[in-house]
């Protein structure tokens, strides 16, 4: 408290001394000490100047900043306040902090990119902008921003806040960068209305803007209001920079011309509308007319032209002849137009049997059937001749022919089926497959290249024709050229293009009919090479039963041995089953067959590929299962192929009695073979197979290379002495096979050769003794087993 009183006393003395005009004043040092004391005690806050010779209080710094702002007219152009810092002569950080503090408390000031601006300056700037706007009629925000050196966004904000207050104008709604006066907008609107009202033909807006100097964005903004308010009569068409104004008077003249032409002629060309300035004539007519008009590729037709075409078609169908509708159509019509017009006309009920050729020719079904008459006698004559001279031809019918002939239907049935298929295709809207309309049952649209490539539209018929020509396995009747030659002689009045397409359409039905005749001839002559169904069924049942029993024994071996046993079973017994079934189906479908014992995998695959699709798919899977590592897939596919719809074999299920019978028969067969076998390797193979069947009650079908694994498995069942005999014989057999495999190696002379001969002789003697022991062991084992069973 004493310190404070002392400070107050010193301050009073200091003040008194300053007010007195005495010659005795405080020295500079004393003043500095006093101020420093006040600063240290926190009673006084000062800011040092950059040279350190002066002090400023924060309040004084704020007053000097505002004074400088006032001196500069309300705006101080600064670069990060550096200039202001140099004038006031204090550190820049103090200036920045004080300016920020001023801005927080004084909302009339703003800091924009280093410029400190007050509200009065903005008001004066707005008045200046308004004066410029009233003089020019329009100003751009970007230009104002450049003039006043302020950001565009800030300038736009200032202008918007003072519109209709200090700035008498309007911002463009489409482009906020432009400022207009109301009078300027009114003048421009009046000019635009006058220009557009005087236009009598379509004119691009870009031409109008460039010719009369309109501001583009204002123009598009105003023109929309004028059109929507009906101040100008017209419409726009096009997009972006190519948009045009079409006056109503021009549109009305166009519509009148189109209506008059259509009424007089019954059709209107799209090209004629293009010449009138209508860019999309087809869409224009669709919007214009909503009746029974037909829109063709190049023109629109009305009921008058349709009636002419209908009359010509009805006359041809009722009289059983043909007609080309091109002469009945107006001159500008193209083959494309005629084709599409026929599609529409043939949708009428009662015309489903019509045929279309060359895109414009309609023929009745009666006419087409009459054209087939000359070929009936030729079919029977050719079938008898081919059956006598070339019977191999009948064994190589194509897959499609087999599928259609399997049902045994005649030519009329096949025509009806094909007609129904084409009706479905036509009703789905497709143009392929020879259909020309929703009800066009058998129409063909194949065309020559010179007729604008209409031939390509009949994909199905062209494909069939190409297949018939390129497939050497298909039983052929006549080529298209031969059919055309017969028709040319029988119908000399037919045009060549029409005749060729008619021949192309008739080629497939005539080939089918001939194959049916050929099949009848083949069936009548009989096929003695085909095996009976009962015989094949018996063989398949026997092989299948053995395969199932062999498969059971595979599970008794380790996994690596199971793979070898499964593959051996698939390549032998299962392959024999597959060959029998493939041969049976091939014979049923009139394919060339061979002895199943001589069928190779390549031959079997070729036969399968010639089968119909519904048979080929399951047979292919069955054939593929023969190369698997396990048998499950084969037995699954076997059940499908042997079942209904394919081989239709009655497979008998295995029971205990049947299994015992097969086991006894196999044991007896192996015993008999063992008694007469002299070859050591085969003797050992038969012996271990019999031992395996005896001890496991399972049938074994194994390759020779699996004998060591079988011998190893038998160690658990035979006595050590018996197992020793088996191992010794196995070793001798391996040694003999190894030595016989190296017979071609050059022999060495002298004692070495004699030693080898002695060893070989010793091995042969041991093998002979071992084989006798094995045979005795196995055969006596069977006798002992028989006694035990009895």
Curated annotation (Swiss-Prot):
GO terms, molecular function: UFM1 ligase activity; UFM1 transferase activity
Ranges annotated as biased composition (Acidic residues): 743-754
Keywords linked to the UniProt accession: Transferase, Ubl conjugation pathway
Gene Ontology biological-process entries: protein ufmylation; response to endoplasmic reticulum stress; reticulophagy
EC annotation from Swiss-Prot or TrEMBL: 2.3.2.-
Name of the top EC class for this enzyme: transferase
Biased composition (Basic and acidic residues): 412-424
InterPro entries named in the record: Ufl1, Ufl1-like_C, Ufl1_dom, Ufl1_N
Pfam families: E3_UFM1_ligase, UFL1, UFL1_C
Residue ranges with Gly residues bias: 429-439
Any one annotated GO CC term: endoplasmic reticulum membrane
Region ranges (Disordered): 404-478, 741-762
Function: E3 UFM1-protein ligase that mediates ufmylation of target proteins.
Family indicated by similarity: Belongs to the UFL1 family.
Name assigned to this protein: E3 UFM1-protein ligase 1 homolog
Organism encoding this protein: Nematostella vectensis (Starlet sea anemone)
Source lineage: Eukaryota, Metazoa, Cnidaria, Anthozoa, Hexacorallia
């Amino acid at each position: 408290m004493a310190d404070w009183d002392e400070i107050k006393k010193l301050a009073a003395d200091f003040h008194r001394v300053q007010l007195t005009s005495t010659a005795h004043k405080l020295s500079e040092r004393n003043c500095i000490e006093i101020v420093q004391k006040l600063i240290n005690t926190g009673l006084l806050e000062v800011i040092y100047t950059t040279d350190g010779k002066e002090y400023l209080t924060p309040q004084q710094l704020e007053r000097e900043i505002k004074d400088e702002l006032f001196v500069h007219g309300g705006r101080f152009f600064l670069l990060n306040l550096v200039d202001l810092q140099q004038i006031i002569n204090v550190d820049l950080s103090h200036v920045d902090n004080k300016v920020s503090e001023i801005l927080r408390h004084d909302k009339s000031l703003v800091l924009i990119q280093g410029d400190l601006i007050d509200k009065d300056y903005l008001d004066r700037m707005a008045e200046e902008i308004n004066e410029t706007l009233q003089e020019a009629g329009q100003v751009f925000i970007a230009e104002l921003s450049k003039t006043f050196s302020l950001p565009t966004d800030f300038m736009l904000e200032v202008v918007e806040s003072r519109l209709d207050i200090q700035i008498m104008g309007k911002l463009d709604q489409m482009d906020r960068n432009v400022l207009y006066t109301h009078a300027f907008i009114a003048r421009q609107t009046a000019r635009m209305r006058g220009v557009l009202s005087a236009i009598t033909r379509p004119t691009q807006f870009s031409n109008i803007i460039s010719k009369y100097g309109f501001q583009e964005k204002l123009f598009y903004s105003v023109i929309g209001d004028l059109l929507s308010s009906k101040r100008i009569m017209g419409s726009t068409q096009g997009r972006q920079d190519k948009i045009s104004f079409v006056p109503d008077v021009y549109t009305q003249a166009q519509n009148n011309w189109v209506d008059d032409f259509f009424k007089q002629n019954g059709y209107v060309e799209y090209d004629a509308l293009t010449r009138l300035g209508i860019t999309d004539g087809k869409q224009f007519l669709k919007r214009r007319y909503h009746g029974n008009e037909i829109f063709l590729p190049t023109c629109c037709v009305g009921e008058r032209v349709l009636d002419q075409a209908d009359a010509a078609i009805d006359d041809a169908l009722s009289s059983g002849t043909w007609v080309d509708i091109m002469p009945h159509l107006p001159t500008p019509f193209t083959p494309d137009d005629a084709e599409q017009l026929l599609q529409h006309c043939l949708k009428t009920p009662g015309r489903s049997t019509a045929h279309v050729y060359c895109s414009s020719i309609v023929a009745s079904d009666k006419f087409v059937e009459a054209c087939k008459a000359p070929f009936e006698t030729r079919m029977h004559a050719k079938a008898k001749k081919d059956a006598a001279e070339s019977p191999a031809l009948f064994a190589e019918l194509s897959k499609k022919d087999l599928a259609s002939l399997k049902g045994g239907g005649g030519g009329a049935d096949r025509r009806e089926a094909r007609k129904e298929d084409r009706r479905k295709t036509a009703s789905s809207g497709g143009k392929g497959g020879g259909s020309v309309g929703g009800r066009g049952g058998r129409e063909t649209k194949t065309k020559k290249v010179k007729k604008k490539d209409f031939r390509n539209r009949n994909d199905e018929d062209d494909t069939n024709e190409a297949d018939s020509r390129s497939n050497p396995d298909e039983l052929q009747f006549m080529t298209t050229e031969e059919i055309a030659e017969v028709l040319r002689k029988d119908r000399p009045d037919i045009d060549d293009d029409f005749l060729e397409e008619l021949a192309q359409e008739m080629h497939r039905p005539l080939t089918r009919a001939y194959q049916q005749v050929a099949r009848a001839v083949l069936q009548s002559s009989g096929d003695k090479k085909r095996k009976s169904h009962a015989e094949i069924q018996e063989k398949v049942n026997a092989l299948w039963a053995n395969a199932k029993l062999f498969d059971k024994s595979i599970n008794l071996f380790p996994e690596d041995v199971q793979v070898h046993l499964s593959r051996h079973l698939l390549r032998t017994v299962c392959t024999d089953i597959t060959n029998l079934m493939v041969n049976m189906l091939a014979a049923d479908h009139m394919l060339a067959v061979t002895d199943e014992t001589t069928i190779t995998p390549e031959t079997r695959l070729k036969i399968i590929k010639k089968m119909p699709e519904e048979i080929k798919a399951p047979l292919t899977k069955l054939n593929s299962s023969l190369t698997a590592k396990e048998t499950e897939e084969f037995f699954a596919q076997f059940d499908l192929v042997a079942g209904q719809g394919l081989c239709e074999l009655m497979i008998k299920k295995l029971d205990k009695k049947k299994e015992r019978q097969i086991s006894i028969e196999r044991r007896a067969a192996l015993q008999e073979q063992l008694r007469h076998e002299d070859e050591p390797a085969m003797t050992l193979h038969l012996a271990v197979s019999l031992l395996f069947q005896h001890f496991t009650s399972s049938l074994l079908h194994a390759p020779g290379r699996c004998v060591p694994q079988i011998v190893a498995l038998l160690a658990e069942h035979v006595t050590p002495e018996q197992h020793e005999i088996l191992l010794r014989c196995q070793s001798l057999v391996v040694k003999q096979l190894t030595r016989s495999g190296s017979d071609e190696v050059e022999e060495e002379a002298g004692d070495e050769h004699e030693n080898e001969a002695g060893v070989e002789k010793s091995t042969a003697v041991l093998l002979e003794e071992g084989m006798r022991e094995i045979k005795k062991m196995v055969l006596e084992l069977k006798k002992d087993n028989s006694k035990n069973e009895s």
